[in-house]
Amino acid sequence: MASLVPCPNCGRRPKEEFTIKGAALSRPEADADSIDWFDYVYLRENPRGAYEEYWHHTSGCRRWLVVARDTVTHEIAACCDAAGRARSEARK
């Protein structure tokens, strides 16, 4: 049985419809120093357990999503629209 991703726009869809683009990190402010930017661009964790990633629904709604999954079991805990999440974080 294929793994299903709970797309907030299309419903449960096979993982093959998505392209994983990497960690869902908070971007440094535009005026951040070069060390912060270096860390953001080049340094990545390789965690075991819960992890958030950007996924693109390339064969569906073509929206960017933030998928929370376990890197050991690959179980998906949550999925939300990346644009909506960015707006909610900006209000904080």
UniProtKB/Swiss-Prot annotation:
Main location (coarse class): cytoplasm
Catalysed reactions listed for this entry: sarcosine + (6S)-5,6,7,8-tetrahydrofolate + O2 = (6R)-5,10-methylene-5,6,7,8-tetrahydrofolate + glycine + H2O2; sarcosine + O2 + H2O = formaldehyde + glycine + H2O2
GO biological process: tetrahydrofolate metabolic process
Binding residues annotated for Zn(2+), in chain numbering: C7, C10, H57, C61
Record's subcellular location: Cytoplasm
DNA damage found in the keyword field: no
Protein EC: 1.5.3.24
Matching InterPro entries: SoxD, SoxD_sf
One GO location term (cellular component): cytoplasm
Main EC class the enzyme belongs to: oxidoreductase
GO molecular function, one term: metal ion binding
Sections of the chain in a coiled coil: none
Keywords, ordered alphabetically: Cytoplasm, Metal-binding, Oxidoreductase, Zinc
Complex formation: Heterotetramer composed of subunits alpha (SoxA), beta (SoxB), gamma (SoxG) and delta (SoxD).
Family membership noted in the UniProt record: Belongs to the SoxD family.
Purpose of the protein: In the presence of tetrahydrofolate, catalyzes the oxidative demethylation of sarcosine to yield glycine, 5,10-methylenetetrahydrofolate and hydrogen peroxide. In the absence of tetrahydrofolate, catalyzes the oxidative demethylation of sarcosine to yield glycine, formaldehyde and hydrogen peroxide.
Name used for this protein in its record: Sarcosine oxidase subunit delta
Organism: Rhizobium meliloti (strain 1021) (Ensifer meliloti)
Lineage, opening ranks: Bacteria, Pseudomonadati, Pseudomonadota, Alphaproteobacteria, Hyphomicrobiales
